[in-house]
């Protein structure tokens, strides 16, 4: 499934956030850009929470977002935090989550450190899992 964005524009009064945005996105995809580039606004448009000033968006199904602030339980490990949102007993996901964290270069920290001791980048990667 693709999301097709054509001639998208978003203005807030006189401030132009983006204009003439043409983009085709194949799932799964990650939206990554520096602060202030309109990522959150674009996601809000895709989720139907914010109308565009002009342009069209087609093919939007389910949209997920990872926000800039993590919402981790500080006393749990990264693996325990990731398992909180999954249905069923957390133990059934342990091996799969360990593999996910290993792919992110966090295999040791994900099991050993409480979230309060993770770096900012490790916390954001935990939120992605």
Label each region the model flagged.
Residues 3, 16-20:
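Conserved structural motif at the start of ABC-family nucleotide-binding domains
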Residues 34, 63, 67-71, 76:
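ABC ATPase nucleotide-binding domain signature
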Residues 47:
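Helix-to-loop junction immediately C-terminal to a conserved catalytic motif
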Residues 54-64:
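Conserved ABC transporter NBD signature motif
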Residues 76-88:
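Q-loop/switch helix immediately C-terminal to the Walker
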Residues 93-109:
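Conserved ABC ATPase "signature" region
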Residues 114-118, 122:
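Conserved ABC ATPase signature
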Residues 126-129:
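ABC ATPase nucleotide-binding domain "signature" region
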């Amino acid at each position: 499934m693709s999301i097709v964005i054509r001639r998208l524009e978003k203005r807030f009064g006189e401030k132009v956030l983006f204009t003439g945005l043409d983009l085709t996105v194949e799932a799964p995809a990650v939206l990554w850009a520096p602060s202030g580039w309109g990522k959150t606004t674009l996601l809000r448009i895709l989720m139907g929470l914010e109308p565009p000033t002009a342009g069209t968006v087609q093919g939007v199904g389910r949209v997920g977002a990872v926000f800039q602030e993590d919402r981790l339980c500080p006393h749990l490990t990264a693996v325990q935090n990731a398992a909180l949102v999954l249905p069923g007993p957390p133990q059934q996901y342990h091996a799969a989550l360990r593999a996910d964290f290993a792919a992110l270069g966090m295999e040791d920290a994900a099991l050993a450190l409480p979230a309060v001791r993770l770096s900012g980048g490790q916390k954001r990667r935990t939120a992605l899992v």
